[in-house]
Amino acid sequence: MSPTYDVIVIGLGGMGSAAAHHLSARGARVLGLEKFGPVHNRGSSHGGSRITRQSYFEDPAYVPLLLRSYELYEEVERSTGREVATLSGGVMVGRPDSLTVAGSLRSATQWDLPHEMLDAKEIRRRFPTLNPSNDEVALYEKKAGLVRPENMVAAHLQLATRQGAELHFEEPMTRWEPYRDGVRVHTAENTYTAGQLVICPGAWAPQLLTDLGVPFTIERQVMYWFQPRHGVGPFRPENHPIYIWEDAEGVQVYGFPSIDGPDLGAKVAFFRKGVVCTPETIDRTVHDHEVQAMADHMSRCIPDLPGTFLKAATCMYSNTPDEHFVIARHPAHPDSVTVACGFSGHGFKFVPVVGEIVADLALTGTTAHPIGLFDPRRLAAAPA
């Protein structure tokens, strides 16, 4: 007889680990299946840091979810003793009419979020590491900062295990089908049944959700670490903010203070400037010309940052055509399958609240959280 569960969760990265935690916290009998080992670096939930912010330039509709996610950061830290968020402040820099600045200001204004607007002179005075041009401004948000992806995943796995979830690593799902009043899931090792299936596939969405009708694009991204020219002191969190910086051509970069000691530098990356790939074909080698392009770009806006190149790492974005998430009951299987995917390079800060939403959907079929923006049916006929 197949082992039977209330819910099977496919994928135990950021979203899946949070889903396993929230489901098991509510008493559900949970099985989690993961292709790789725990807290791996093959997908989208690694790299030491991810930006978190509330003045959200992508759309004001995200703000209520961010406010809840911030509450859950604290709950996770209290429950596990792991640091998952460092809120040391952040700036959104660009021309006043740039998406980064204008969109952030729109969300801050609509939701009455604490913020300050800084002109170029004030940016340079407050943050001497930054060198904006005279026509650039910044929205400063005190509650912006970073989340630590590996710690976040480890914390949610810890909580799920503590609450009785059964987590199987290096056991990927090979296929699933509807079965009686639920689902049947196959792996190379076994066959399992459950009343509900949750699929959090990350970059494997095009392979695992072919019947969803969403044209996902998987994009290779590169993260870089540099030793600043004059050491990391000026780049410590008390001196140097997280930032998203949009230039006159609309190119965005994002970066972090130095958080891991004097020898590990500071991290920076381009936002959505990668090449299309698959999890099987991604080039995980970072080439000299890529490092040079990053250093050249940063030498204009943060001149002291690109001193000595230390290391680089790759990850993958799973993009939707409109760059908004997919979180919903599966339209083709609305009674038994919940999906959370297509986070388009800006999802990790939402991990705790997405876990809560997924648990709502899987156990009750609905959620009080505002997720209308994330219905996959909006994309069913969209071009990739």
From Swiss-Prot:
Enzyme class of the recorded protein, top EC level: oxidoreductase
One of the record's GO cellular component terms: cytoplasm
Cofactor requirement: FAD
EC number(s) recorded for this UniProt protein: 1.5.3.1
Domain of life: Bacteria
Catalysis: reaction(s): sarcosine + O2 + H2O = formaldehyde + glycine + H2O2
Keywords from the UniProt entry: Cytoplasm, FAD, Flavoprotein, Oxidoreductase
Signal peptide range in chain numbering: none
Cross-referenced InterPro entries: 3-OH-isobutyrate_DH-rel_CS, FAD-dep_OxRdtase, FAD/NAD-bd_sf, MTOX, SoxA_mon
Binding site for FAD: 6-36
Modification type S-8alpha-FAD cysteine: residues: C315
UniProt keyword Transmembrane, yes or no: no
Gene3D superfamilies hit by this protein: D-Amino Acid Oxidase, subunit A, domain 2, FAD/NAD(P)-binding domain
Entry's cofactor comment: Binds 1 FAD per subunit.
Keyword Cell membrane tagged: no
Molecular function, one GO term: flavin adenine dinucleotide binding
Subcellular localization: Cytoplasm
Cited function: Catalyzes the oxidative demethylation of sarcosine.
Family to which this protein belongs: Belongs to the MSOX/MTOX family. MSOX subfamily.
Quaternary structure (record): Monomer.
The protein's name in its UniProt record: Monomeric sarcosine oxidase
